[in-house]
UniProtKB/Swiss-Prot annotation:
Cofactor entry: Mg(2+); Mn(2+)
Protein name: DNA ligase
Gene (UniProt): ligA
Residue numbers binding Zn(2+): 411, 414, 429, 434
Signal sequence region: none
Keywords attached to this entry: DNA damage, DNA repair, DNA replication, Ligase, Magnesium, Manganese, Metal-binding, NAD, Zinc
Active-site residues, record numbering mapped to chain: 119 (n6-amp-lysine intermediate)
Gene Ontology CC entries for this record: cytosol
Function noted in UniProt: DNA ligase that catalyzes the formation of phosphodiester linkages between 5'-phosphoryl and 3'-hydroxyl groups in double-stranded DNA using NAD as a coenzyme and as the energy source for the reaction. It is essential for DNA replication and repair of damaged DNA.
Length: 670
């Protein structure tokens, strides 16, 4: 492909990708699948890699994040980002309307045109577009000076890097709120707790923490979103009203909340507020009130500002979702991954119409940091569907009888050893037979990527547990047809199929068996390395930390986790029972003289032609090694869409980068 053809294709791809970004993030009506989007994105990445001088700061490929910064630069807002005055009652809303009319010299019976907007609970930012190109993004800061977070805001998919208009304004400053959807917030916190990191207290903190990351690659991995709601300085365009401004920027590709609505007078403001109060808990994001603005920009200018807030707007806040109560007890509970979490049993109290009697304390480090004790008077907060949490302790109410709960020495469910992993906040039960972990461990053990017990899914595993037929994974190999026939709507043929699937799993590869055990930090890739290095589960069980660390890609954290797992007598007994039942993991054979013998591959980004596990199997089948990180010893990096730090490192080290098509071509060359 010559350079001109490439340039034309790059321009077409950028236009198409930005169009699909707008349809997906701003208009919520995608036209293509994620896989189709990734295919277009990968093509653009490939062309920009082959023709580096075609790269541009407004390309969709710039959203993946770059090298970390040392610090944030300061940005002075051309027009200050003022805070809003608050209102909490119907009377205060009516007072606001009266003040507006008095200042404008209007009669009391005149109804003002207002705009009502959900008040997003996120991080306020300003986007600066110069001739349609996003050049600067900053936080609100103190309203006058904020921080330059352009590199992070460029990773937010909903923010267009170029406005979708033929004649963009010379300058357009847009204010908006970056937020983290509730579902994404819950996934992020679950992941952080699984990795031993402290959870975020609420979605607002998560959004703010993500945008204020010095490493934009971390920001890029978090599904942040934005709604834009106000202009800053504008040159080369004019708007008569807030409604016109929102319509226009929406046409230009900037996300605008579809719940924003023009209203007339106090009665319609109150109706909108009550509607948002009722809808609050069903929204996919956090809001903490309603913002009311005079629609006309001419009237806004006439009304002007006070020292800290505009006269033409007010924030109507929802009732607080906090309450004061007493911690009657602190109970350790075991999660599905073995993490032991302290949970506060509270004196029942009503918060936002819901009676709350329990609250998460997250982990012992967090509990100790807040100094939460049994008997304490505390402030709790409830946010949407998120489990209530203790915000702070009212230490002035202590009597001296309050007592802390120490980390338990053994698991409260099974009595197994409790381990506090160094450099983690999580406290974990290491017992494979722990009742609180059994369900998830059995589902994982039987899954397709582990022992592949075809047909034995969650529904049947739950029935096995309910009937008391299994207590850990070893019990699967003792099941009989008569026991399966106790299930609801179970026939002879289906029972036989399930038994056959369990029987067939006895001969799975050693790497699958190691992965199926659910050892912390040991995924499929590490399981293959361990199987290749030790050849049997007995050898792995006897391995020392030094022997484990000698394996490429096995670090201290993984080594400690493996040793801790096999030190547990319950885990060793479970394995012995499986072997006694006939489980015989088989050693894997590598192809000698294959196409990739002696070659190391790393796969990164979103692959569209095959999954990452499938690609790794292709490499290993041909005698190669599929690694998880890039080093000087890496021969090839296969890059899919949104490839990040691994692709950057490959380029720095001069490692050859392949597209998926180029990888498949190598595989077929023979």
């Amino acid at each position: 492909m010559d350079k001109q053809t490439a340039a034309d294709r790059v321009a077409a791809l950028r236009t198409e990708l930005e169009r699909h970004n707008r349809l997906y993030y701003a208009e919520d009506r995608p036209e293509i699948t994620d896989a189709e989007y990734d295919l277009l994105f990968r093509e653009l990445v490939d062309l920009e890699t082959r023709f580096p001088d075609l790269a541009a700061p407004d390309s969709p490929t710039q959203r993946v994040g770059g090298a970390p910064l040392d610090k944030f630069e300061q940005v002075t807002h051309r027009i200050p980002m003022l805070s809003l005055e608050n209102a909490f009652t119907d009377v205060e809303i009516a007072d606001f309307d009266d003040r507006v009319k008095r200042f404008l010299g209007l009669h009391g019976d005149v109804e003002i045109d207002y705009v009502c907007e959900p008040k997003m609970d996120g991080l306020a930012v300003e986007l600066v577009y110069e001739r349609g190109i996003l050049t600067v993004g900053s936080t609100r800061g103190d309203g006058v000076v904020g921080e330059n977070v352009t590199h992070n805001l460029k990773t937010v998919r909903g923010i267009p890097l170029r406005l979708r208009c033929e004649q963009p304004p010379e300058l357009l400053e847009v204010r908006g709120e970056v937020y983290l959807p509730l579902a994404a917030f819950q996934r992020l916190n679950a992941q952080r707790e699984e990795e031993g990191e402290p959870p975020f207290a609420n979605p607002r903190n998560a959004a703010a923490g993500s945008i204020r990351q010095l490493d934009s690659r971390i920001t890029a991995r978090r599904p942040l979103a934005i709604f834009c709601y106000a202009p800053g300085e504008v040159r080369g365009a004019s708007f008569a009203a807030q409604t016109e401004f929102l319509d226009r920027i929406g046409e230009w590709g900037l996300p605008v909340n579809p719940l924003i609505r023009p209203v007339k007078g106090v009665a319609e403001i109150l109706a909108y507020y009550r509607e948002m109060t009722e809808r609050r808990d069903s929204l996919p994001y956090e809001i903490d009130g309603v913002v009311v603005k005079v629609d006309s920009f001419a009237l806004q200018r006439e009304l002007g500002e006070k020292s800290r807030s505009p006269r033409w707007a007010v924030a109507v806040k929802f009732p607080p979702r906090q309450a004061v109560t007493v911690v009657e007890d602190i109970v350790p509970s075991v999660g599905r991954t073995g993490v032991i979490t302290p949970t506060a049993n509270l004196r029942p109290v009503e918060v936002s119409g819901v009676t709350v009697s329990r609250a998460t304390l997250h982990n012992w480090e967090e509990m100790e940091r807040k100094d939460i004790r049994i008997g304490d008077t505390v402030v709790i907060e409830r946010a949407g569907d998120v489990i209530p949490a203790v915000v702070k302790v009212l230490t002035e109410k202590r009597s001296g009888s309050e007592r802390p709960l120490p980390i338990p020495a053994v698991c409260p469910e099974c009595g197994s050893e409790v381990v506090k992993i160094p450099d983690e906040v999580a406290v974990r039960c290491m017992g494979l037979s722990c009742p609180a972990q059994i369900r998830e461990s059995i589902i994982h053990f039987a899954s397709r990527d582990a022992m592949d017990m075809e047909g034995l899914g969650e529904k049947y595993i739950e029935q096995l547990l309910r009937l008391g037929l299994v207590k850990n994974v070893a019990d699967l190999y003792t099941l009989t047809k008569d026991q399966f026939m106790q299930f609801d709507r179970m026939g002879d043929k289906l029972a036989e199929n399930l038994l056959n699937a369990i029987e067939a799993s006895k001969q799975r590869e050693l790497s699958r068996f190691i992965f199926a055990l659910g050892i912390r930090h040991v995924g499929e890739h590490t399981a293959k390395l361990l199987a290749g290095a030790f050849g049997s589960i007995e050898n792995l069980e006897r391995a020392t930390e030094e022997e484990l660390l000698s394996i490429r890609e096995v670090g201290p954290q993984v080594a400690r986790s493996i040793i801790t797992f096999f030190r547990n007598e319950g885990n060793r007994e479970t394995i012995r029972r499986m072997f006694k039942a006939g489980v015989r993991p088989t050693a894997e054979e590598k192809k000698v003289g294959g196409r990739f013998t002696g070659k190391t591959f790393v796969f990164t980004g979103a692959l569209t032609r095959f999954s990452r596990p499938e690609a790794q199997k292709m490499v290993e089948k041909e005698g190669g090694h599929a690694a998880g990180s890039v080093s000087k010893k890496t021969d090839y990096v296969v890059a899919g869409a949104e490839a990040g730090s691994k692709l950057d490192k490959a380029r720095q080290l001069g490692v050859r980068v392949l597209t998926e098509d180029e990888f498949l071509a190598m595989l077929e060359e023979g």
